[in-house]
Amino acid sequence: MDEKILKFIRKMHLLSLAVLDDGKPYCASCFYAFDEDNLAFIVAGGEQSAHVKAFLAEPCVAGTVALDTKIVGKIEGVQFRALAAPATAQQRKIYFARFPYALAMNPSLYALSLSWVKFTHNALGFGKKLVWQREQI
């Protein structure tokens, strides 16, 4: 993955997650930590929350991470596709290192393993986009 994409993902902390809930679209905002070794967002969610129930039933998800700005020249963000699954022990460590206060809540954690990312960064040139796709094995 291009370092410009990774740098943006590292500096942000909130994503918008889109899932299908019984065939209907549903969105949720999630704080995230990022597993750079596996290129996965790590998010928390209660097992009874709508977005978790939805991606446990249909693990293909999509989402965005965007810089909040009204200045066109500073627009920056990613759109992504991913597969959701329970987080590994190592991913739990990554999440709690970023959000140590979450330990007290003992949340269920999930990894959104990236399969495709489109990064828009107008500071690189208006409408400049970088696309990354995971190699198929």
Show which residues each predicted segment covers:
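Helix-adjacent hinge/juxtasegments
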Residues: 51-82
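Charged, amphipathic alpha-helical segments
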Residues: 1-3, 48-51, 93-95
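Short secondary-structure boundary/capping segments
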Residues: 6-7, 33, 53, 101-102
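Short beta-strand segments
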Residues: 12-47, 55, 61-66
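Charged, gly/pro-rich active-site loop segments
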Residues: 72-137
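A generic "binding-loop/recognition-motif" signal
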Residues: 47-48, 115
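Extreme N-terminal tail/first-helix region
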Residues: 1-15, 137
